[in-house]
UniProtKB/Swiss-Prot annotation:
Its EC number is 2.7.4.3. Monomer. Its main location: cytoplasm. ATP binds at residues 10-15, 123, 132-133, 200. GO terms for cellular component: cytoplasm. It catalyses: AMP + ATP = 2 ADP. Pfam families: ADK, ADK_lid. AMP binds at residues 31, 36, 57-59, 85-88, 92, 156, 167. NCBIfam families: adk, PRK00279.1-1, PRK00279.1-2, PRK00279.1-3, PRK14527.1. This is Adenylate kinase. Residues 30-59 are annotated as: NMP. It is found in: Cytoplasm.
Length: 214
């Protein structure tokens, strides 16, 4: 089962990716992890990626596609894989298609921007332990304090409203067009496309995914 997850940052993809991996026994392929592993391995592709990144440039789509092809040929991908964070653009999706990388399901996690802002901006973390709270959905017993140690909670830089809104604008400009792209692909019979209501409780979203994926 080959799956692509689409949705804005904060739409709940990460939580459900864990569930899909465990339930269907497929690995999650994150382009960031893949690039780091390739560089570490010192392979030909890894060396190319390192040179580009060392020069402060973005790795080309061709190189990422070559790495994806190499990665999905590995033994743990024989039953499928889960792509999160790739493709991000229509040229990347086209390049994937030209490389013969097919997918069975494209799942779109649909959550309104304002709810995403609410979800992310309300997060508070206890840096030392990694415990995460939410001022509205999962508040600490004492406002601003960690339940276990009583230490001060902080807001991650990535969770500040300005940053979140900027990431949402980038998502709508770059990645949202993929929704139309994969809807057409599904109409042509090349994949199956499903929209998942990401505003529901985690367990309800999980049940919806089980229904879609079987």
């Amino acid at each position: 089962m080959r799956i692509i997850l689409l949705g804005a940052p904060g739409a709940g993809k990460g939580t459900q990716a864990q569930f899909i991996m465990e339930k269907y026994g497929i690995p999650q392929i994150s382009t960031g992890d893949m690039l780091r592993a390739a560089v570490k391995s010192g392979s030909e592709l890894g060396k190319q990626a390192k040179d580009i990144m060392d020069a402060g440039k973005l790795v080309t789509d061709e190189l990422v596609i070559a790495l994806v092809k190499e990665r999905i040929a590995q033994e743990d991908c024989r039953n499928g894989f889960l792509l999160d964070g790739f493709p991000r653009t229509i040229p990347q999706a086209d390049a994937m298609k030209e490389a013969g990388i097919t997918v069975d399901y494209v799942l779109e996690f649909d959550v309104p921007d304002e709810l995403i802002v609410d979800r992310i901006v309300g997060r508070r973390v206890h840096a030392a332990s990694g415990r995460v709270y939410h001022i509205k959905f999962n508040p600490p017993k004492v406002e601003g304090k960690d339940d276990v140690t009583g230490e001060e909670l902080t807001t991650r830089k990535d969770d500040q409203e300005e940053t979140v809104r900027k990431r949402l604008v980038e998502y709508h400009q770059m990645t949202a067009p993929l929704i139309g792209y994969y809807t057409k692909e599904a109409q042509a019979g090349n994949t199956k496309y499903a929209k998942v209501d990401g505003t529901k409780a985690v367990a309800d979203v999980r049940a919806e995914l089980e229904k879609i994926l079987g």
